């Protein structure tokens, strides 16, 4: 048996790969001899323990593969106890105790590949009990360190149970339970890390799971739960490298003790009891060893170093108890675990803030794998699920257990600068956490003092500003009077009506309304003189020009010099009527024949020998009497009939024209233009033309050198050839009986 044993540190997959060809070649001699009832199969079936060509090295492929093939045929041929290997697809012919499995057609290379796959599931953790072919019966020996899965299959197969029962009870149910637990934890972690349950509830669930696990372990002490196969992810590998080496050392130490027990006692039942007693002690040693380790080892797998202090309390080594790390403020990116050197420095900075709680001593190896799988899960969920990152983070969604670490960190005056990010974090980090940085942690950073300082600064700034006076707007530019006369009044009845109705056709509508707001409201009456003498202001402007001019052509852009209106052409009917009214009220005064001598006699007789005060009945009555006497004398001087009744004397014309406040030389110039008879009095047409020239001069127009005939014709009003009789039959000079006014 010594020649068939492989070295302790040898890898089963490597040996199977190197000897696959030789094993296939050995199938020609070894398997043939077994099928034909050769010496190897007969010797093993009889239980003599003599080696065959495959076992002792006499055959072609001596070594581990030949040993396993021999074990397979030995177990199937002897009929005592189950085989240590999985049965070939041919069936269970060897279990009947027949003569060597004559119906088997599987090659040794297939069996070697199956052995290599079963051994290379995980690193070696302990020795594997196998049947002693030399001793026969149920004796168990330790050959080499193999995986936990292989050990569980072998231990379950040793005994009087059937091979089908070994597969159903020993291997599948623990795997199914572990997978269900793993998926349950994954579903529990598949939510937003901010909206998870409180740590206290999670702790209670873990306690109940540990109690149930202890009860199962006490009821079935002979079973060893195989290690679950975790997903090949880069994050759990760091945690596995931290926790596995210590447990593997314990496993090697326990394997040596178990091999000593197997060497001293060779009976089958005694060896099973020793193995059953060794396994619980080995499990307790592992749990006690893992109790002292989490304070130092699991930190590299559970810390996220490049985050500010608000996120350190929730990502501390206390995640063994609280499995969901919660995202607090100031997490710009979700980073993968960094190298252990940086992690140790960040862990030392975080130690004064967070207290590490040790794990309970009664935790087995399966719990360690659960915690290792449980801690990286929230990172994977936060990277994969975008809906949880996009959710709105409010104050009510944050658990109450995560509030106190944040306040504790905020009370510290200084925050350490975050270290440089690893280059792999660019591809893993998501862009969504900065949005939560803008919404959730903005309010804690604004303290009460900063808010009050900002409010006081704004109040002081507003108080120091000089108050502006909006009541006096800047002056408006002068309006452009295109197409209007410079003497046109600014406000007319049309503009006032448009302002009251709300519509305006002029560009100065806003200026008019602003002026009206400052003063009192105006009525429909125009504020300025709407009854102006300027006929140009009353004309309608901006009308479309006549399409046909005097020449008959359709030249819209011609100047039409002969068809335009000129102020020197004629006097309008309205102006003529106004001037005639002034003439009618002043005509014939002081022109009654013999009026001067009669006026002198009347004044002397009235004021004869007494003073005006003596004639009156009180003070002031003399002045009133004089005014009345003067008015009566003036009215008595008016000529009632004859040619003198149509004239306005020069003194009366001078008195009326002097009210225009024009210089005396200009008034004399106007008199020379209109006094055509040189008789010291003006007729109706002459007086009307004189008033019209004075009005034109007041509007800024020059006094013409001569008055055109059209103006005289318009002043006559259709009455041509009015004969004005001269008083005294030509004594006034001129020798002409009359002239056309």
From Swiss-Prot:
Q: Does the keyword Disulfide bond apply?
A: no
The record's section on InterPro entries has:
EF-hand-dom_pair (IPR011992), EH_dom (IPR000261)
Domain EH as annotated: residue spans: 629-718
CDD domains for this protein: EH
Keywords (A to Z) from UniProt: Lipid metabolism
Bias-annotated ranges (Polar residues): 436-461, 495-525
Bias type Gly residues, positions: 26-36, 46-65, 94-104
Record field: compositional bias (Low complexity): 385-406, 603-616
Which Pfam families did the record assign? EH
Q: Map out region (Disordered) in residue numbers.
A: 18-151, 183-567, 603-641
Q: Which domain of life is it from?
A: Eukaryota
Decide whether keyword Lipid metabolism is in the record.
yes
Which protein family is it in?
Belongs to the IRS4 family.
Q: What does this protein do?
A: Positive regulator of phosphatidylinositol 4,5-bisphosphate turnover and negatively regulates signaling through the cell integrity pathway. Involved in rDNA silencing.
The protein's name is: Increased rDNA silencing protein 4
Gene encoding this polypeptide?
Answer: IRS4
């Amino acid at each position: 048996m010594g020649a068939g044993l492989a070295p302790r540190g040898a890898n089963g997959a490597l040996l199977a790969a190197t000897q696959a060809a030789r094993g296939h070649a050995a199938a020609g001699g070894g398997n043939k001899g077994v099928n034909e009832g050769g010496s190897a199969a007969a010797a093993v079936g009889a239980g003599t323990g003599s080696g065959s060509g495959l076992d002792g090295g006499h055959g072609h492929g001596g070594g581990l593969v030949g040993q396993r093939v021999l074990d397979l045929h030995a177990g199937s041929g002897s009929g005592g106890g189950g085989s240590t290997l999985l049965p070939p697809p041919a069936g269970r012919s060897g279990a009947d105790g027949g003569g060597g499995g004559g119906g088997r057609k599987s090659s040794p290379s297939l069996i070697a590949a199956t052995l290599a796959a079963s051994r290379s599931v995980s690193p070696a953790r302990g020795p594997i009990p196998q049947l002693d072919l030399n001793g026969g019966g149920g004796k168990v020996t330790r050959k080499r360190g193999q995986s936990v899965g292989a050990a569980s299959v072998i231990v379950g197969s040793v005994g009087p149970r059937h091979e089908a029962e070994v597969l159903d009870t020993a291997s599948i149910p623990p795997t199914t339970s572990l997978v269900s637990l793993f998926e349950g934890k994954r579903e529990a972690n598949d939510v937003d890390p901010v909206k998870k349950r409180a740590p206290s509830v999670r702790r209670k669930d873990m306690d109940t799971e540990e109690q149930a696990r202890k009860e199962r372990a006490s009821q079935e002490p002979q079973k060893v739960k195989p290690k679950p196969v975790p997903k090949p992810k880069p994050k759990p590998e760091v945690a596995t490298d931290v926790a596995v080496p210590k447990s593997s050392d314990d496993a090697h130490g326990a394997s040596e003790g178990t091999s000593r027990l197997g060497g001293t006692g060779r009976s089958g039942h005694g060896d099973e009891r020793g193995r059953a007693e060794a396994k619980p002690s080995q499990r307790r040693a592992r749990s006690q060893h893992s109790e002292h380790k989490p304070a130092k080892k699991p930190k590299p797998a559970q810390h996220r170093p490049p985050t500010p202090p608000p996120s350190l309390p929730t990502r501390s080594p206390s995640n063994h108890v609280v499995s969901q790390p919660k995202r607090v403020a100031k997490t710009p990116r979700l980073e993968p675990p960094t190298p252990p050197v940086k992690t140790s420095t960040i862990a030392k900075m975080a130690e004064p803030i967070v207290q590490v709680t040790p794990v309970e001593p009664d935790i087995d190896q399966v719990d360690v794998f659960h915690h290792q799988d449980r801690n990286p899960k929230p990172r994977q969920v936060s990277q994969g699920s975008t809906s949880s990152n996009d959710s709105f983070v409010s104050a009510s969604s944050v658990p109450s257990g995560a509030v106190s670490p944040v306040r504790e960190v905020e009370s510290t005056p200084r925050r350490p600068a975050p270290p440089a990010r690893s280059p792999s974090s660019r591809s893993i980090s998501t862009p969504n956490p900065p949005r939560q940085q803008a919404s959730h942690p903005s309010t804690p950073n604004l303290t009460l003092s900063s808010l009050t300082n900002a409010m006081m600064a704004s109040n002081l700034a507003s108080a120091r500003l000089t108050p502006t006076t909006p009541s006096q707007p800047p002056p408006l530019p002068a309006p452009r009077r295109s197409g209007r006369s410079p003497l046109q009044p600014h406000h007319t009845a049309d503009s006032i009506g448009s302002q009251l109705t709300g519509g305006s056709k002029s560009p100065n509508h806003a200026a008019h309304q602003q002026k009206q707001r400052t003063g009192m409201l105006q009525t429909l009456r125009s504020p300025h003189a709407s009854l102006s003498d300027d006929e140009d202001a009353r004309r309608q402007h901006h009308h479309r020009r006549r399409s046909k001019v005097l020449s008959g052509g359709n030249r819209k852009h011609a100047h039409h010099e002969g068809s335009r209106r000129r102020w020197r052409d004629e006097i309008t009917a309205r102006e003529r009527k106004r001037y005639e009214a002034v003439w009618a009220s002043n005509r014939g005064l002081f022109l009654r024949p013999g009026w001067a001598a009669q006026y002198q006699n009347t004044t002397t007789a009235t004021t004869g020998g007494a003073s005006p005060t003596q004639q009156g009945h009180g003070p002031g009555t003399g002045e009133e009497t004089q005014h009345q006497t003067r008015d009566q004398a003036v009215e008595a001087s008016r000529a009632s009939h004859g040619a003198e009744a149509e004239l306005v004397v020069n003194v009366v014309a001078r008195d009326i024209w002097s009210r225009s406040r024009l210089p005396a030389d200009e008034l004399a110039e106007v008199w020379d233009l209109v006094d055509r008879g040189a008789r010291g009095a003006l007729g109706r047409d002459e007086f009307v033309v004189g008033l019209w020239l004075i009005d034109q001069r007041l509007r800024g127009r020059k006094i013409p050198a001569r008055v055109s005939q059209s103006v005289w014709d318009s002043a006559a009003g259709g009455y041509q050839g009015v004969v004005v009789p001269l008083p005294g039959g030509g004594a006034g000079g001129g020798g002409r009986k009359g002239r056309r006014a």
